Curated annotation (Swiss-Prot):
Organism: Nitratiruptor sp. (strain SB155-2)
Known function: Na(+)/H(+) antiporter that extrudes sodium in exchange for external protons.
Identification of the protein by name: Na(+)/H(+) antiporter NhaA
Subcellular location: Cell inner membrane
GO CC annotation: plasma membrane
Length: 388
């Protein structure tokens, strides 16, 4: 019985279903007489005081700035593992998904920009349709079971990891606010300490987490988005240490320890906190405005065109090969699934339009619609192309 529960918790489809439940619950609460309770819950003030340190934020921002930093720490651990010991460890393995991921970022961004070039504030959301929600996309793919070659699952995972790496770079370069020099100096000191600990082969996970918290606080205060602290911490934790004849794999241990927390608490809570859209506040003209249309078309059309188009071109030019035992139509189906932006797109949306409340409902609904269309069409294509 215990084994079955553990297996269920590690199934991608279980994670996807939980995210759907969290989203539907948020939509129900926001559009019911309980909407005031939902809104007040998200805006509950939470303060932390420790000596001179004082951080006060509503619960929603603790989720977006705090818990999502833990999520990006987990993503950073995944990226490091794949680079050192996995699907990104060899150029030949990462060429095809990297090219496809590049297309999956460039084409949706250009499509969004083409619809919003006239409005500088609206144009700030160009990165929203470039994201892929790996948990949700793999969840849809897992519904097809063994009918899909394992190589396609590996491709989608690798593409999403490269996509996440791109999202991290985008956040660092384009969604950084006014900088605080003092906080950046403190963050630099924390990074230096982590680097020294790495070189000295420190094996205490608690020590890394303690310095990591200091790094997160300083980055939070610096104007750089706090989630980047999670990535930096992950990359500075030693992958494998051989000490006194004993092997310590800190990265794998931490990644394994965070798996359930990230997928069954952090991501569902993020979806619950950010997917609540008041449908009564959205008119059809607003839904078909340039920003929502840029997001919907970017996710559903731009993403599949970019991933499939760049991938197909790479195959035709003999730069890369299709995943083993997969067909071109199956690759197209997976390219469509890459348009499930969901939590990652909602997160970038919260950064792009945090001061522009005019978009805050229609753009979120656009993320949900674009992701839903990508999930449904991707599933149909793959089920038809992989009929038993």
């Amino acid at each position: 019985m215990k084994g079955k529960v553990v297996a269920l918790l590690h199934k991608e489809s279980t994670i996807g279903i939980l995210l759907i439940i969290a989203t539907l619950l948020a939509l129900f609460l926001e559009n019911s007489p309980l909407s005031s309770f939902y809104d007040s819950f998200l805006h509950t003030p939470v303060e932390i005081r420790f000596g001179a340190l004082h951080i006060a934020k509503p619960l929603l921002l603790w989720v977006n700035d705090g818990l999502m930093a833990v999520f990006f720490f987990y993503v950073g651990l995944e990226i490091k593992r794949e680079i050192v010991d996995g699907h990104l460890s060899q150029i030949s393995q990462m060429t095809f998904p990297a090219i496809a991921a590049l297309g999956g970022m460039v084409v949706p961004a250009l499509l969004f920009a083409s619809l919003n070039f006239h409005d500088e504030k609206a144009l700030n959301g160009w990165a929203i349709p470039t994201a892929t929600d790996i948990a949700f996309a793999l969840g849809v793919l897992s519904l097809l079971g063994n009918r899909i070659p394992f190589s396609l699952k590996v491709f989608l995972m690798t593409l999403a990891i490269v996509d996440d790496l791109g999202a991290i770079i985008v956040i660092a370069l384009f969604y950084t606010t006014k900088l605080s020099l003092t906080s950046l100096v403190v963050a630099s000191i924390a990074l230096t300490i982590l680097f020294i600990m790495n070189r000295m082969c420190v094996i205490s996970k608690g020590a890394y987490i303690l310095v990591g918290v200091a790094l997160w606080v300083s980055v939070l205060k610096s104007g750089v988005h706090a989630t980047l602290a999670g990535v930096a911490l992950a990359l500075l934790i030693p992958y494998r240490i051989n000490k006194n004849g004993k092997i310590y794999e800190l990265t794998k241990q931490m990644e394994h320890g965070l798996h359930l927390w990230v997928n069954f608490f952090i991501l569902p809570l993020f979806a619950f906190a950010n997917a609540g859209v008041n449908l009564q506040n959205i008119s059809m003209s607003e839904l078909f405005g340039s920003v929502p249309m840029g997001i919907m078309l970017g996710l559903f059309i731009g993403k599949q065109l970019g991933v499939f188009g760049f991938g197909y071109l790479a195959v035709k030019l003999k730069i890369a090969k299709l995943p083993k035992e997969s067909t071109l139509i199956q690759f197209y189906g997976v390219a469509v699934l890459a348009g499930i932006g969901f939590t990652m797109s909602l997160f970038i949306d919260s950064l792009a339009y945090e001061d522009a409340q005019i978009y805050q409902y229609a753009d979120k609904l656009a993320v949900l619609i674009g992701s839903l269309l990508s999930g449904i069409w991707g599933y149909i294509v793959l089920s038809k192309s992989s009929a038993p």
